[in-house]
Amino acid sequence: KKMIGWDEILQPELPKDIVIHSWRGTAALAEAARKGYYGILSNGYYIDLIQPASHHYASDPLPADSTLTPEQAKHVLGGEATMWAEWVTPETIDSRIWPRTAAIAERLWSPRTVTDVNDMYRRLGIISLQLEELGLMHKRNQDMMLRRLARHEDIGPLQTLVSVVEPVKEYRRYQMRPQTMLSPLTGVIDAATPDAEGARRFTWMVKEFLADAPRYQLYRAELTQMLSEWQESGAALGPMIDRSPALKEIKPLTKGLSELGEVGLEAISYLKLGQPPAREWREATTLKLDEAAKPYAALEFMVVPAVKQLVQAAVEIGQPRRATSSM
């Protein structure tokens, strides 16, 4: 057996056979390695902080700028996913652990040069389904929780909303929602996941669509369909919220969902026509996007930056494209 302790135990007289478990980060881990101690990294892998899989995938116990010698680097044993459980229940624990920890596992057993996030997410989607086949409830429980919140009405509009929002990150939930032993953990924030699949797909399509300038045809139909769905779902959620008190806290998000859909459709229309919008539209749109960027019910839209990119492209219609340097 090996004794393992957090960073704080690293004192001058500490025996070298004790392993340092670093929550402080790679710098603290490297310091221990230089002093001859073996170490494990947890910083970057705290899954209770609700960071997306891409965040964890970018965290390496031996980062590219590491100055450890090859011999010192051997003292870095790897990493460990960690989770404090104040905000989890039997209904939500699987969605808070899986499938992100599969991405962490791949990060830890892969060379540092493996960094293709898009391909990671492609494969993670397959792994997620395989985990469900094994009996994990990270996917199934979400729909169950949404049905309960909707009082067994059609949850399609709620699913649309949840696909583009994520719980606030790190410790912001504590700041926005003081917790007691009686705090319910059955809200939309608990049904939402750290990786909003719809938001990720939308962001990727916007990038490809804008790269297709000046034609703006690539993924235009798909983006138009998704934005229209946001508009329709936002409108449909209003009556549902009126009938379900448990959903009242997300009412500002329904307006935001509709307006994000509206703004995105209008921006695409300007790009399609090749006509820049009027200044009044730009000013009104800025106000809508600023409002949509605010968190409500400890949830935040993950699509606001991509919609802003559409708006900016529309505003810049007719302007000279920025030159890129080959240097």
Name the predicted role of every residue range.
Residues 1-327:
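Substrate-binding groove of N-acetylhexosamine-processing glycoside hydrolases
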